[in-house]
A protein has these predicted regions:
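Ferredoxin-like alpha/beta domains used as RNA- or RNAP-binding modules
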Residues: 1-10, 17, 27-110
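Short, charged beta-turn/beta-strand-edge "cap" motif at the junction between a beta-strand
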Residues: 19-22
Length: 110
């Protein structure tokens, strides 16, 4: 039984599940067929985007419309990529912490 191909979008936050970059977060720069090109604004820029199989990625629901618009226009700067990535990671962390009581967390660590 074949795995369903993930429907990724430009500007979507993803995490690498396999390879030497396992655990690394990226933004989707381009989707073509069964390959995805990823950037992070640090080591991976559009000129040397990471090519990855979508099966090796954990997708997030978070998408940066600002990143997608700049990628479409072709004027992405490293600082823009880093800012978008930081914003999405911060938003993801906030969503994970919603509804948690800090006092309960402190008691759980005792």
């Amino acid at each position: 039984m074949a795995k369903a191909i993930k429907q990724l979008q430009v500007g979507q936050l993803v995490r690498s599940l396999a390879g030497h970059d396992k655990g690394q977060y990226y933004l989707v720069l381009k989707v073509a067929g069964v390959k995805v090109w990823l950037v992070d604004g640090y080591k991976r820029l559009p000129a040397n985007a990471k090519q990855k199989n979508p099966c090796h990625l954990q997708e997030s629901k978070l998408i940066s419309a600002d990143f997608a618009a700049k990628a479409q226009a072709g004027n992405l700067r490293p600082e823009d990529m880093r800012a978008c990535l930081r914003a999405l990671l911060s938003q993801q962390a906030d969503e994970l912490n919603v509804g948690k009581n800090p006092d309960e967390e402190a008691l759980a660590n005792v």
